[in-house]
Amino acid sequence: MTQKWLFSTNHKDIGTLYFMFGAWAGMVGTSMSMIIRAELGQPGTMINDDQLYNVIITAHAFVMIFFMVMPIMIGGFGNWLVPLMIGAPDMAFPRMNNMSFWLLPPSLTLLLMSSVVDNGAGTGWTVYPPLASVIAHSGASVDLAIFSLHLAGVSSILGAINFITTAINMRSNNMTLDQTPLFVWSVAITALLLLLSLPVLAGAITMLLTDRNLNTSFFDPAGGGDPILYQHLFWFFGHPEVYILILPGFGIISHIVCQESGKIESFGTIGMIYAMLSIGLMGFIVWAHHMFTVGMDVDTRAYFTSATMIIAVPTGIKVFSWMATLYGTKFKFNPPLLWALGFIFLFTMGGLTGLVLANSSLDIVLHDTYYVVAHFHYVLSMGAVFAIMGGIIQWYPLFTGLTMNSKWLKIQFTIMFIGVNLTFFPQHFLGLAGMPRRYSDYPDAYTSWNVISSIGSTISITGIIMFILIMWESMIKQRNVFIWTNMSSSTEWLQNNPPAEHSYSELPLINL
């Protein structure tokens, strides 16, 4: 057991470890979000401490981003599926793969420690100085959070090197780049983004660390520094990061849509690849749209507004290509397809509010209100999370050799769909009415929408608990898969069920 799970170099075992870690972190992060919604469920205070409230907000963001979405999407699905889809016996660097995973539990431990020592890191996930400086946050909390980010960053960089090498070098002999499955492309592009953006974050937080402990003044105007420099460095990482969170989801949805529509390939495969590449590369040149309120030149604001809007073009190409793939199909509303349709609809909604926020003049008013919270939760809670749910249901029979109860899954989808929309749709109204983020209390005028939002969060968590029960039921009933009933949309379905410990011991010859 120790050999298998602690020292594993098998991509399937490491993928499973990532899934279990992500599920655990997801439960931690969801618990935090429930505390936030309980606090905001009525006017007046529940926690009685704004610092603690902001610590929970900060930890919720970090846990969900670095320890739930990224490990599940890149580590879980990436490790399991990339080698199977390209006909590789394993990842390019199996031992580095193992190290990538085992850097995450210590990283999460450091993050949770930062919440419980001293007063906690109540900086928001952006960790802006001067709030993150030693004057405003004395004690070890922010330092622990910085070390946590360093570990998570090293883990992601090692993983990125591994995925890029695997996708380039380990493909089947005659599999050309345009025949490479879209999910493999999405993970490779994600890895490229990680490789280019994380070193900048590492630089920024290292400078913050020395500002706090070694008396430097990179971000302190008293010593000739500039806090805006930190914002530029952070968002140069932060914006690609949000595309890192959603790109693997694009790949997952492409596969689900292709398989459920019963077509031989996705509509406009090459266009899909170019769209992902453009989204990834353009993600690096729009970072300052997070900073419209810091007093930038009007020409600078005009550039970042228009560049941000142009990203909507490749995103639109992807959305319409998914719809074109589904065109003419006689739908059987299987659970994975429901999640994919939910993803397409709600991700588009989130994209539209993003287009609103791209306008620098409007963003001056909407910045730091709940409109922004609603926007990014639409693309994360209903984009990334819906893609994860759809992907788990789609490939669960491949990973385990078992089947989940389809009827229950449809009910669970409905509950969760209602829950997340009820949680986040009212937040648009709160934002337009001017309710600011990161405050634990609010004027009575905002009560009704907050009550509805908190009810929605309770419905959502019911849906998540139901999903865990459905998975548990499939495991205790042990309903084995005898044959894949769906048309194989890519090579991972050619495995046994569940796949043998080692796949492709003899390399496959792929004729497409």
Swiss-Prot record:
Cofactor binding description: Binds 2 heme A groups non-covalently per subunit.
Binding site for O2: 243
Protein's membrane topology: Multi-pass membrane protein
Positions with a binding annotation for Cu cation: 239, 289-290
Annotated Gene Ontology cellular component terms: mitochondrial inner membrane; respiratory chain complex IV
Binding site residues for Ca(2+): 39, 44
Metabolic or biological pathway, per its Swiss-Prot or TrEMBL entry: Energy metabolism; oxidative phosphorylation
Main location class: mitochondrion
Residues reported in the UniProt entry to bind Fe(II)-heme a: 60, 377
The protein's required cofactors: heme; Cu cation
Transmembrane segments: 16-36, 55-75, 101-121, 144-164, 182-202, 233-253, 267-287, 307-327, 337-357, 379-399, 413-433, 451-471
A GO BP entry: mitochondrial electron transport, cytochrome c to oxygen
GO molecular function: cytochrome-c oxidase activity; heme binding; metal ion binding
Subcellular location: Mitochondrion inner membrane
Keywords associated with the record: Calcium, Copper, Electron transport, Heme, Iron, Magnesium, Membrane, Metal-binding, Mitochondrion, Mitochondrion inner membrane, Respiratory chain, Translocase, Transmembrane, Transmembrane helix, Transport
Residues that hold heme a3 according to the record: 375
UniProt catalytic activity: 4 Fe(II)-[cytochrome c] + O2 + 8 H(+)(in) = 4 Fe(III)-[cytochrome c] + 2 H2O + 4 H(+)(out)
Enzyme Commission numbers on file: 7.1.1.9
Stretches of the chain forming a coiled coil according to its record: none
Positions bound to Mg(2+): 367-368
Family annotation (PANTHER family): CYTOCHROME C OXIDASE SUBUNIT 1
Subunit structure: Component of the cytochrome c oxidase (complex IV, CIV), a multisubunit enzyme composed of a catalytic core of 3 subunits and several supernumerary subunits. The complex exists as a monomer or a dimer and forms supercomplexes (SCs) in the inner mitochondrial membrane with ubiquinol-cytochrome c oxidoreductase (cytochrome b-c1 complex, complex III, CIII).
Task of the protein: Component of the cytochrome c oxidase, the last enzyme in the mitochondrial electron transport chain which drives oxidative phosphorylation. The respiratory chain contains 3 multisubunit complexes succinate dehydrogenase (complex II, CII), ubiquinol-cytochrome c oxidoreductase (cytochrome b-c1 complex, complex III, CIII) and cytochrome c oxidase (complex IV, CIV), that cooperate to transfer electrons derived from NADH and succinate to molecular oxygen, creating an electrochemical gradient over the inner membrane that drives transmembrane transport and the ATP synthase.
Similarity comment: Belongs to the heme-copper respiratory oxidase family.
Protein name, per record: Cytochrome c oxidase subunit 1
Lineage: Eukaryota, Metazoa, Ecdysozoa, Arthropoda, Hexapoda
Gene (name only): COI
